[in-house]
């Protein structure tokens, strides 16, 4: 029998940071990572710069690939796999392979849930239409970049940091960009004097 088993749900920056720290503290730890998307070990803050072309390839957003996490850190990494149930009494998770539909269980001694943030989607008619995107995953960035290559104009809903970075990068690609912010100023989470600098 090996060491204790750590299951991490979410293979982006926070989840892998926790997994790496735990593995450094206990080298015998068996680490299993589940990621719903196809990419691991990336920070979503780079997505606007990928859309704008400053970061040329999607793989350049990634610090370590799933294969590198396996070979260099000894992690078991399941991409395109979603954890659909946590059985706390039996200390196992049920995972679904999103490519073939199969399910399997993974036992754990410790569990980290690092599924990241969710975009706030305003109740606007048409938000589920083609050409409407959120900015969360590498796959989102690829879809936005592909669409931006065929577009002349873009609307960005949200005047926070990510929204402004995305608006800037789309404008640098030559798109006419309109920003919509529900509150009375851009960068509403920052002090008002910062908002005035970008208005």
Indicate where each model-derived feature is located.
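Conserved phosphate-binding and hydrolysis motifs of nucleotide-dependent enzymes
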Residues: 10-15, 116, 158-163
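Short glycine-/acidic-enriched loop or helix-start segments at secondary-structure transitions
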Residues: 18-19, 43, 88, 122-124, ...
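Short, mixed-charge, low-aromatic patches
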Residues: 21-27, 43, 96-104, 155-160
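Beta1-alpha1 glycine-rich phosphate/pyrophosphate-binding loop at the start
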Residues: 2-78, 169-193
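FAD-binding core/adjacent interface of flavoenzyme oxidoreductases
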Residues: 1-9, 62, 67-155
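Predominantly flavin-linked oxidoreductase catalytic cores and closely associated redox partners
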Residues: 130-199
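Residue-level detector of alpha-helical recognition elements and their boundaries
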Residues: 33-37, 46, 84, 126-127, ...
């Amino acid at each position: 029998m090996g060491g204790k088993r750590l299951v991490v749900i979410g293979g982006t920056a926070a989840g892998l940071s926790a997994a790496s720290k735990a593995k450094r503290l206990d080298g015998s730890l068996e680490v299993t990572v589940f990621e719903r998307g196809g990419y691991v070990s990336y920070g979503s803050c780079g997505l606007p710069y990928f859309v704008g072309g400053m970061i040329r390839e999607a793989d350049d957003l990634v610090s370590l690939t799933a294969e590198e996490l396996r070979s260099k850190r000894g992690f078991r990494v399941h991409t395109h796999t979603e954890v659909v149930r946590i059985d706390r009494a039996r200390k196992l998770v049920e995972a679904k392979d999103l490519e073939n539909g199969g399910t399997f269980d993974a036992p754990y001694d410790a569990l980290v849930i690092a599924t990241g943030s969710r975009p706030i989607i305003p109740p606007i008619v048409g938000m589920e239409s083609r050409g409407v995107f959120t900015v969360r995953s590498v796959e989102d960035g690829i879809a936005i970049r592909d669409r931006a290559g065929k577009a002349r104009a873009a609307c960005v809903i949200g005047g926070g940091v990510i929204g402004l970075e995305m608006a800037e990068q789309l404008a640098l690609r030559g798109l006419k960009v309109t920003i919509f912010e529900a509150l009375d100023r851009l960068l509403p989470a920052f002090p008002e004097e910062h908002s005035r600098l970008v208005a």
